[in-house]
């Protein structure tokens, strides 16, 4: 049995989503050198911690890997693809992990924001058609997202994230009550209920073109329009 300690820390006032995550993760990650971060509306696979910790150990010194993600879209896996994992550009904030050096490389303020406008199209090709809008909305005060700033740092540094082929996380927040989640979602996944504890990884840290298209396709304009229509259908 592992010995565990639970530490609680309460804020005297609501700091907001972005500030709370940034300050909380910074405190933990600077103490332990790495962190696994969860939200309270996530359902975890039985092997979630095995997957996350193995990824953290395996890619600790591989700085081209920016994060380990527990959630995965329902990707179309090629028949000749034999690994349990794949690399993709855009990180996921639904059950994820990273290391202190990568976390502390993020520019959270982006004070010289105007110089990044020329990267709008490239950023969207890299991570999906909604990337620049979310980043610009944050800058304009229309959202408090820390995650899009994390993704932008990853984009600027040309780094990747590790994902499971079968998701180790399921988001249970699509009841319309969550801050950023609606009742219907295109992100329902194939959830791993297996007892598998050892995972296989690609030999090289590189993007598989087919898996990339399948994963990033969830953020395409067509998918987003369809999702918006379905959201309105499910409202009534």
PLM-predicted stretches and their roles:
Residues 3-37, 42-236:
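An acidic/histidine-cluster motif and surrounding catalytic segment
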